[in-house]
Amino acid sequence: MDSDFSHAFQKELTCVICLNYLVDPVTICCGHSFCRPCLCLSWEEAQSPANCPACREPSPKMDFKTNILLKNLVTIARKASLWQFLSSEKQICGTHRQTKKMFCDMDKSLLCLLCSNSQEHGAHKHYPIEEAAEEDREKLLKQMRILWKKIQENQRNLYEERRTAFLLRGDVVLRAQMIRNEYRKLHPVLHKEEKQHLERLNKEYQEIFQQLQRSWVKMDQKSKHLKEMYQELMEMCHKPEVELLQDLGDIVARSESVLLHMPQPVNPELTAGPITGLVYRLNRFRVEISFHFEVTNHNIRLFEDVRSWMFRRGPLNSDRSDYFAAWGARVFSFGKHYWELDVDNSCDWALGVCNNSWIRKNSTMVNSEDIFLLLCLKVDNHFNLLTTSPVFPHYIEKPLGRVGVFLDFESGSVSFLNVTKSSLIWSYPAGSLTFPVRPFFYTGHR
């Protein structure tokens, strides 16, 4: 009966994925429990919601806390197995006829208490087997959590870089067409400068794309090494106490070395090529803009939308800066108009034009069709430029100093300029602007 009970007890504490005692056990929504490492590997590429490996029921939640009760029961079961092992005749000290309860860290042997204090072993470090094994297992689990975090981070970076390559290609194609259209407006047409501009754009794109490809290879290799190390640590965690202590070796140090030299994402940046006479020509339509300013933290959602949508980042800390929203006093509905805004002392900023209805609704939806904005947003340690209607990233260098805004109701277009470089950041296609708008400026100071 005792044997049947012991078998049933062990079965309830066994992971159905690895068929070993549960390690860092978690219980998912359907009630089944698994080793956290086993579940992580099982769900690594699963769609959300992932299915339970046992009953296939979908689990809307994918992040679980350690089941402390199960963890304690597994500890009890491991102790029982250890004492059963130590009670065998082989583990009785031949000299002192005592159970070998101590582990010698120097020669990786089991000793009785009297042997551990002998002249031969007295200078060595000794630990009770139970405590030493549990402590080492916790070290392994801690290292596995760090490894898994890095595995996920590396996978996210790899996904983002492949997505960046796709978006970069789209940006370059649209930018080349935009540059051609701008040069056609010049009289006389600067054919040589246009050709050089486009050749430089294509050359930079090819160089950046090759950087991205090399980065993908590094990230793939790092992902492979991290997973191999993670699985090696997991196998070590599953070993019985004595085997764990004897086989541990330098596995923790090796796992730490794998974490070194993590590949860093490539941040593409195209050079802002100057267009001769661009700012001079638009200055003919220069207007002075009067703004109504207000300090606000409400419209910080504008940047939160972009962060979550484009970069999959968490919310900004609304306490870290003052955000100034400003609307132009004048509404434009016809003609050509040009103005400049200084963004040199701003970290996150947005500028452009918006429909009156967008202001009245106090809307912050970045995907609204009522706004034509250029946004600069700092993500990690890199600045990103985007435009709205639709939201689209641009990989041109961040403008320093003043940014120009040009409204052309005759063609139905809005353009943004890097004034310092006399270059075009972005120009909406003809026919995009079909309603009255007023200037909008939004900035955060740190």
Swiss-Prot record:
Keywords: Coiled coil, Metal-binding, Zinc, Zinc-finger. It comes from the Eukaryota. The keyword Zinc applies. Zn(2+) binds at residues 93, 96, 115, 121. GO terms for molecular function: ubiquitin protein ligase activity; zinc ion binding. A zinc finger (RING-type) spans 15-56. Residues 129-158, 190-220 form a coiled coil. A zinc finger (B box-type) spans 88-129. Residues 269-446 form the B30.2/SPRY domain. GO terms for biological process: innate immune response; regulation of gene expression. CDD domains: Bbox2_TRIM43-like, RING-HC_TRIM43-like_C-IV. One of its GO terms (cellular component) is cytoplasm. Belongs to the TRIM/RBCC family. This is Tripartite motif-containing protein 43B. It comes from Homo sapiens (Human). The lineage of its organism: Eukaryota, Metazoa, Chordata, Craniata, Vertebrata.
